[in-house]
Structure formats: C-alpha cells, structure tokens
Amino acid sequence: MAYNPKILQKPKEGEEITIKDGKLHVPNYPIIPFIEGDGIGSDITPAMIKVVDSAVQKAYKGEKKIAWYEVFVGEKCYQKFKDHKELSPEEQWLLPDTIEAINHYKVSIKGPLTTPIGEGFRSLNVALRQKMDLYVCLRPVRWYGSPSPVKEPQKVDMVIFRENSEDIYAGIEWQEGSAEAKKLIHFLQNELKVEKIRFPESSGVGIKPISKEGTERLVRKAIEYAIDNDKPSVTFVHKGNIMKYTEGAFMKWGYALAQKEFNAQVIDKGPWCSLKNPKTGKEIIIKDMIADAFLQQILLRPSEYSVIATMNLNGDYISDALAAMVGGIGIAPGANLNDTVGMFEATHGTAPKYAGLDKVNPGSIILSAEMMLRHMGWVEAADLIVSAMEKAIKSKKVTYDFARLMDGAKEVKCSEFASVMIENM
C-alpha cells in the first residue's frame, strides 16, 4: 500500500525499504523516518544523525546515503499540531501519519518521549509498541570501555529479548475504590471463590496476560538470533515458581517450541535442552532461570549467559540492571521489532532539566543507530560506529556523566562527543 499522509508532507527524496520473501531489501538511498524526541531529544538526535551520516559516507564513499524523514510523536508533535481540530487529543500527541510512516518505511529511529499528563494518556512509548504490535524489545548489552561499578564489565555480553505486548504492561488495571475494581474483586470472590485478596476493600487490581502465541513468537526470534549470531545459549528468565500459569507457562511453552521447531533434545531428564546450530554445527543450550537468582548470576557469573528471553516486567528490570554494569542507561541501545518493522530508540528518558544544554551523552541513540545499520545490512558503517565509540571513550574525551568517573578525562559537549567519534572513524 502507498503511504498517503493526511498532514505530513511526503519525503521529497529517497527510496522505500521493502520486504521480499521475508527479507529486508534496502536501496542505496533509503528513507528512514526519525522522531527527534522530547527534552534532550533535540541534543542527542542531531548528534546521532551526524555520526551516522559520517559512518555511511566513510564506509561507502558516497554510494549509499540515508534520506532522513522527520515524523512526530510527543511534546514536539503536540506543539506542532495542537490546533488541528480534526485530530483527537491522543492523535495530537501520537500522529496517525507517523504510525503509517513507521509501518510503511520499515526501519525508523526515535529519541526519548515524554508522557502527557492527564487522565487517559498512556506512555507514548508503550502506545507506539502496542499500536504496531512491535512485540520484541531487543536490548544488546556489552562494554565499550566506559566507567563501570563492577570489576570485570568486559564479561557482560548479552542480548535481551523482552516481550513487548503482554504482561502487566498491557495496562489492564483498575484503581482502588473504583466501580470496576469492586466489580472484579466481587466476581473473583463470589464466582471463582478466591480467598487470597488480603484487603479487598482497598485494593487496586491488575491483570497479567501471558499467552502461548506471544511466548512462542518471542522465543522463536530469540533462538533464531542465537543461530544467526553464533551464540552459545538462550535462557528463559521467569518467576514460574510463584506465577505458575503465566510465567511458569512462558518457560514451558518456550521449551516446547525449541523442541518442536528447532529439534532441541532434552539434556538428562530436562528441562534444559540443546540443539545444533544448523549454520555452524555448534551446540546451543536452551535453559531457564528464576528471575531473582538471575539478577544475582549476572553479577557473579555474567559470562555464562548470552541470549535472554523474558517477559515484559522482568525484561525491564534486567536490561536496566545490566546497563548499569557497563556504563549506565545513557549508553544502552534498544529496538522494538515485529516481523516486518524495526523501530530503534534511545532507551533513557527525556531529562528535561538538561534539554537544550548540549550536555548529555548521545551514546544510547548512536548505538541504537548502529543496531539499525546492522539490521539494514550496512555492517561496514555499523562497525565504524562501534570502533569509533570505543576509541572516543578510550581517548577520555567524554560527556560529563563519564568525565566525572574517569581520571584525566576532558569533558566535552554532546555535539562535541559526536565530533570526537567522527575523528576516530
């Protein structure tokens, strides 16, 4: 289907990324929609574009180039389109044209988004993922030489597949004292004979959906990633010891899928199993771990874990805990994916007190752009960004968050850090 925006202008140049036989086909001048983001978005996104354009130019000598196409969500969207009466209040923050563009052009990148204040407004990040069914939140975590609170951060090299569409993030909950909460509690107590609600008169209630289909499509992606990237293991992280029919089912369905679709064989008496990587012949172990024990293990034995598949809430905790071990969320990249669309993003917040000061670390969105280039098959440009990031940090010309933790560092601005990276390509 053609892209026919109602409010935005169509891109003036560039070509569309398409999908043929399940594979991404990327032209030499692809249109990439970008959302600048709120708060520090106006600092970090231009820095990212500068770094990406330089890496692409250096890698391909002008044969390839990105046609950047700005689309809008968040505060900037609201300020720009609040007088458009044909838009609902939600659409003034989350423009329908933007969703259509992200779906149509297949690959996009975004800065951090503020959540509108007021009843009925959800997190815009969550709304974007849910509207487009971007069911995988992909978070690679590795060390680039930045200051770290742990002794051996180089041992951390994990990729988290966090389920994006289910769990308590589905937002199915009711406030304490509301008619809906009272009705649901009454139903649970009287129809289902639930006796475990300790304070029924003053409880808010939420529902945690975990489905077989949602689990299978996430686990399938995680195992495919392990095969494609020659990883030694996939670990299901869950609290199935407590939540047997949701998180326990996630583990059970995960093992069943590995056996059914990837011919994984049970080790000893299970439940761990192993499969042979069809591309390399190496063994991939499929295992699981209780979430609280896993949070200990990533500190004590991080090198034993590689690809992680988990649900929404666990994935949120784990990805931020791992990010802290390698330099913090300011440098943590991420992406939201489904079978056809990839939306790459800065994983931190809008930090409004630093907005417009040209101060903060643009590392998260730059490394998310590196993921984006790799996803597009532009591996040479992606490799340039990784090596430039490592060299820039090693040179100790870094933004304030790293400079205060490094002896002999020279503090540079956000835009200057981008220039330091370009000098190191």
UniProtKB/Swiss-Prot annotation:
Keywords: Glyoxylate bypass, Magnesium, Manganese, Metal-binding, NADP, Oxidoreductase, Tricarboxylic acid cycle. Binds 1 Mg(2+) or Mn(2+) ion per subunit. Its cofactor is Mg(2+); Mn(2+). Mg(2+) binds at residue 316. D-threo-isocitrate binds at residues 123, 125, 129, 139, 162. The record marks 169, 239 as: Critical for catalysis. PROSITE patterns: IDH_IMDH. One of its GO terms (molecular function) is magnesium ion binding. Its EC number is 1.1.1.42. NADP(+) binds at residues 114, 348-354, 361, 400, 404. GO terms for biological process: glyoxylate cycle; tricarboxylic acid cycle. It is an enzyme of class 1 (oxidoreductase). It comes from the Bacteria. Catalyzes the oxidative decarboxylation of isocitrate to 2-oxoglutarate and carbon dioxide with the concomitant reduction of NADP(+). Belongs to the isocitrate and isopropylmalate dehydrogenases family. Homodimer. This is Isocitrate dehydrogenase [NADP]. It comes from Helicobacter pylori (strain J99 / ATCC 700824). The lineage of its organism: Bacteria, Pseudomonadati, Campylobacterota, Epsilonproteobacteria, Campylobacterales.
